[in-house]
């Protein structure tokens, strides 16, 4: 797996890759660098005003292609790589993307290829976008084929998660609607198990940029730390938790916040380490003090 060197440089120059203090990823694992692929739009996150309207988001992304040439370069590269993946065994083919940031990349690719875009919403709604001004709710999608396009893959859980029963994610959502999907293409891969996870769901994962040791040595501001983490994220994370505890992640346990699934997954992965290191009681006390509720009332490990 080799990164597209031009897209890798755009990702770095735009701040779409950045070194961070330890934080929680959507998978519940700990990360020390972050990939905000949407920053390649260079729009100051203005896209967020369209985050609940896929048609508006797709039209906005098309506008950004003309306003930001380097963003258009990414769409060029995606389109070139995705086009051969479209199966000629189906009468209807489409590009699919999930709410919200997938749409920034999946929409323009669908427009370039002059094929429909399947917009997947977190609440289960599906729209079929035929062009810049037409959206169909609850479309008939049976016997069609789609390639999923995303902004980023880490563990791949938003695309396909076998941990839930039944499995969840954009791919099961498409398949439940009658769409055949066996390819997913993202701008950036963190190479943290997402490809292997999607393979369990019979989905081939592809990316333009891979956050591997070569990328980190070239683009990280702290390459020694980044490469050490990259070589064994779990070992690095365990050492961090034993030495520092989990207080840096306390905001994720806000009972009124948006990261409770992330917090639950964190505990599922790491609570045994915190207990063994004598750090769990410190987290429980901090959560109770800050949010006024016991940790086990806010986050039920093993729950939905």
Which residues are covered by each model-predicted region?
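PRPP-associated nucleotide enzymes
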Residues: 1-304
């Amino acid at each position: 797996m080799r990164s597209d060197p031009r897209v890798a440089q755009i990702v770095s120059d735009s701040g779409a890759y950045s070194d961070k203090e330890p934080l929680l990823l959507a998978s519940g694992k700990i990360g020390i660098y972050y990939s905000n692929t949407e920053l390649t739009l260079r729009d100051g996150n203005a896209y967020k005003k369209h985050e609940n309207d896929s048609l508006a988001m797709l039209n906005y992304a098309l506008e950004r292609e003309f306003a930001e040439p380097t963003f258009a370069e990414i769409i060029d590269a995606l389109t070139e790589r995705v086009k051969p993946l479209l199966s000629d065994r189906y009468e209807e083919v489409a590009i699919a993307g999930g709410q919200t940031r997938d749409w920034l990349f999946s929409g323009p690719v669908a427009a370039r290829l002059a094929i429909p875009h399947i917009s997947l919403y977190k609440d289960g709604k599906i729209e079929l976008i035929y062009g810049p001004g037409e959206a169909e709710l609850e479309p008939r999608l049976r016997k069609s084929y789609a390639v999923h396009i995303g902004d980023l893959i880490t563990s791949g859980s938003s695309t396909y998660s076998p941990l839930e029963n039944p499995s969840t994610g954009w791919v099961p959502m498409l398949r439940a609607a009658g769409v055949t999907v066996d390819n997913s293409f993202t701008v950036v891969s963190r190479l943290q198990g997402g490809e292997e996870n999607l393979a369990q769901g019979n989905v081939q994962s592809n990316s333009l940029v891979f956050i591997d040791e070569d990328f980190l040595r070239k683009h990280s501001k702290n390459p020694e730390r980044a490469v050490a983490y990259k070589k064994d994220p779990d070992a690095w994370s365990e050492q961090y938790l034993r030495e520092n505890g989990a207080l840096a992640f306390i905001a994720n346990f806000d009972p009124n916040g948006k990261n409770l699934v992330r917090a639950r997954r964190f505990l599922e992965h790491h609570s045994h380490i915190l207990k063994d290191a004598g750090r769990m009681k410190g987290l429980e006390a901090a959560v109770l003090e800050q949010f006024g509720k016991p940790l086990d009332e806010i986050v039920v490990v093993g729950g939905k």
